[in-house]
Amino acid sequence: MEIKITKTTQPGQKPDQSNLGFGKIFTDHMFEMDYTEGIGWHDAKIVPVHNLSLHPACMVFHYGQEMFEGLKAYRGKDGKVRLFRPDMNAKRTNNTNDRLCIPHIPVEDFVEAVKAVVKVDEDWIPTADGTSLYIRPFIIATDEFLGVAPSKTYKFMIILSPSGAYYASGLAPVGIWIEDEYVRAVKGGIGFAKTGGNYAASLAAQVKAHDDGYSQVLWLDGVERKYIEEVGAMNIFFKIDGKIVTPALNGSILPGVTRDSVIQLCKKMGYPVEERKISAEELIQAQKAGKLEECFGSGTAAVISPVGKLRYQDDVMIINNNEIGEVSQKLYDTITGIQWGKIEDDMGWTVEVK
């Protein structure tokens, strides 16, 4: 794939690395590529970040035909810039595209585009501990048409945002609300796809959870309303009686890149891993029996997020005395160690940006 590069003549000022936050600061450049039916993907380019000029009838505004991804670039102490399993994000992009009638992007083109735009803006990658460059690839439908049908034109873009450490004061357990009123997704729907509608549907429950002092929502299945599925921005794991248990992918759960990494590492560390149905009632009983030993989420933003408290209806479960568990800490140290080049990547997961 040939990528035309046009660099900005007015580079922005680099931000204070002690106050980056998440998703509010953007680098100088972006990647763009267009799709036209009968031609395919074309005109790949890296240009200065700019506002988009779109007709108000563009289909993305009306029927939500869009998708997005999320990954990061990390600058190690050795000065090298690494991506973490970008091929997995590329493959997941195409799985989402299949469900939403969006054309595939070749995996190698996706990875090449990510590497190219990160290379152009590599001076924006922060160096402070725990910081990274968040990468947001996304595709929107651009046909100017009010009929309900797949668009014939699309725009693929990648923007970059330097991000602060998720745990500014160190790894800490969070409280999670198990939602039993609203539903995020159902089998046969779009739960496995990374598309905006899933996140918009989560907002009401998220606001309710925040109002009650919980940081995130843990969703139940949309049919029986009793089986654990995923957290709003993470997959979920439990250590029950020595075994690592996580909900099986069933079409309504996002197949997380970090989730897959956790499963592989747990097996390598010698922990038995079960991918299966888990009911909220099973968690309550395990906690009462002293067998719910640990709970943690996994995702790109936090990597590993220990859970110290779960609330389901009138039951509040305190897990591991609201402290970080052994498995959570080992996984966090291992994955972040690989990402930042602190430990050897014997899994072959990192891709260097040169």
Would you name each region that the model predicts?
Residues M1-H55, F61:
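Intrinsically disordered, low-complexity, positively charged segments
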Residues M1-S18, I25, Y227-K354:
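Conserved catalytic-core subdomain
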Residues D16-N19, P86-A90, N94-D212, V327:
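Extended Lys/Arg-rich, glycine-bearing segments that form polyanion-binding/interaction patches
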Residues K24-E32, I46, M59, P173-L220, ...:
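Active-site-adjacent loop/helix segments that line or gate small-molecule/cofactor pockets in enzymes
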Residues D34-W41, M67, Y74-G79, P86, ...:
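Short acidic-glycine loop/turn motifs at beta-strand connectors
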Residues H55-L71, A301-S305:
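Conserved phosphate/anionic-ligand binding catalytic regions in large, soluble enzymes, centered on
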Residues Y167-G175, V183-T195, Y199-A201, K208-W219, ...:
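NTP/phosphate- and nucleic-acid-binding module
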